[in-house]
């Protein structure tokens, strides 16, 4: 079903409160490209890249942003339908690949060398490349320049800094303690890890959740709470509000938080996360990726579009102008974007971080580590007990 772009946008807004029926989406068919990307990304910019592709090749490109596309894709792709190209965070792609829904991609070495090597690791599943890395997200330390012109380089400096700021009615640091995505950089700094990654594969029995490094990181976090430098019940909205009102000097968050801080008029900077025991904090790294549907009859066209139109300075610039991508996988365009110190810091933290594993076992990891951190932070369990239980849950 072909719908003109303007009409489609109207149709989409009318359907926001309804489930997007499969019939409302363009069908997979030879000789045209259908792309799905989430509604919070620069889909209008991506459509501009599609127009250039159509002008050069005569191949029509339709960009759609269906609701819950990450759940819809496996349903429709399993029946041989859906988009030719799907954009989503890389960690869902392992499950798709396991179900046989993604085509293996074969970019040549010259093309692979245009992108940062660690981004290719994010889209490798059982040793095979299953998507193209596009953009990179990681947590950074965000600080209020008026309260704290020089942010601390180490976690160990934070207790003394908090005492100084408390004397002025402020606090040093508030961030989301309820979700392990935010607490993991500290837990992983001295040697914690989710699943061991070797030779392009994850060993699901080699889990680093209760090793000495993970225990040291979580113990430090618990001590910050015990010593009243942080509150165990701090969640995302509490931490965001405190930082954006100028009540706390620092928070830990990602590029998605910048627009709200801009609106709040806080004079802020984004920098590298503090070290712990001399080791860099290791945030989980998410990579916005583009996979090709195994059922697509247009795999070569999809490859041409992604390699020679989207993953170019001009292509990524069109998407970025619509909605900021953050840091990007393409070295040449990242060098341009990194003139913004916020983006340079995001990439630096990502390069020091841990690629979020793209395996189904991560759901057990999130559940177990969330419980462990909350129990240790509240004093319901010791750090050793909490992490031992988490390790057992993940590996059982």
Curated annotation (Swiss-Prot):
GO CC terms in record: ATP-binding cassette (ABC) transporter complex; ATP-binding cassette (ABC) transporter complex, substrate-binding subunit-containing; maltose transport complex; membrane; outer membrane-bounded periplasmic space; periplasmic space
Assembly mode: The complex is composed of two ATP-binding proteins (MalK), two transmembrane proteins (MalG and MalF) and a solute-binding protein (MalE).
Major location category of this protein: periplasm
Pfam families: SBP_bac_1 (PF01547)
Organism: Escherichia coli (strain K12)
Subcellular location: Periplasm
Origin superkingdom: Bacteria
Name of the protein in question: Maltose/maltodextrin-binding periplasmic protein
Family stated for the protein in its record: Belongs to the bacterial solute-binding protein 1 family.
């Amino acid at each position: 079903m072909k719908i003109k772009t303007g009409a489609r946008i109207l149709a989409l807004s009318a359907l926001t409160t309804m489930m997007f029926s499969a019939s409302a989406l363009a069908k997979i068919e030879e000789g045209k490209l259908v792309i799905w990307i989430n509604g919070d990304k620069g889909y209008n910019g991506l459509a501009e890249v599609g127009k250039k592709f159509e002008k050069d090749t005569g191949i029509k490109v339709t960009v759609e942003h269906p609701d819950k596309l990450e759940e819809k894709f496996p349903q429709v792709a399993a029946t041989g339908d859906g988009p030719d190209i799907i954009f989503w965070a890389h960690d869902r792609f392992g499950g798709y690949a396991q179900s046989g829904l993604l085509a293996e991609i074969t970019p040549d070495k010259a093309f692979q060398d245009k992108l940062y090597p660690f981004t290719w690791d994010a889209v490798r599943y059982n040793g095979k490349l299953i998507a193209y890395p596009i953009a990179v997200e990681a947590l950074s330390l965000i600080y209020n320049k008026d309260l704290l012109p020089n942010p601390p380089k180490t976690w160990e400096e934070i207790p003394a800094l908090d005492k100084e700021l408390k004397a002025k009615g402020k606090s040093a640091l508030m961030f989301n303690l309820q979700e392990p995505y935010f607490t993991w950089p500290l837990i992983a700094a001295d040697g914690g890890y989710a699943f061991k990654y070797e030779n392009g594969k994850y060993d699901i029995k080699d889990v680093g959740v209760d090793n000495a490094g993970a225990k040291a990181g979580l113990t430090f976090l618990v001590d910050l709470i015990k010593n009243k430098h942080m509150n165990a019940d701090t969640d995302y909205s509490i931490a965001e509000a405190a930082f954006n009102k100028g009540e706390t000097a620092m928070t830990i968050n990602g590029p998605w938080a910048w627009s709200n801080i801009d609106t709040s008029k806080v004079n802020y900077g984004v920098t590298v996360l503090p070290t712990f025991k001399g080791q860099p904090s290791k945030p989980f790294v998410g990579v916005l990726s583009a996979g090709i549907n195994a059922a697509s009859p247009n795999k070569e066209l999809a490859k041409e579009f992604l390699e020679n139109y989207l993953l170019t300075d001009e292509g990524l610039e069109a998407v970025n102008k619509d909605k900021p991508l953050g840091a990007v996988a393409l070295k040449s365009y990242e060098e341009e974007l990194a003139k913004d110190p916020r983006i340079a810091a995001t990439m630096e933290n990502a390069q020091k971080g841990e690629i979020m594993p793209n395996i189904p076992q991560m759901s057990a990891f999130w559940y177990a580590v969330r419980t462990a951190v909350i129990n240790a932070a509240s004093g319901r369990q010791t750090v050793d007990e909490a992490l031992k239980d988490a390790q057992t849950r993940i590996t059982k």
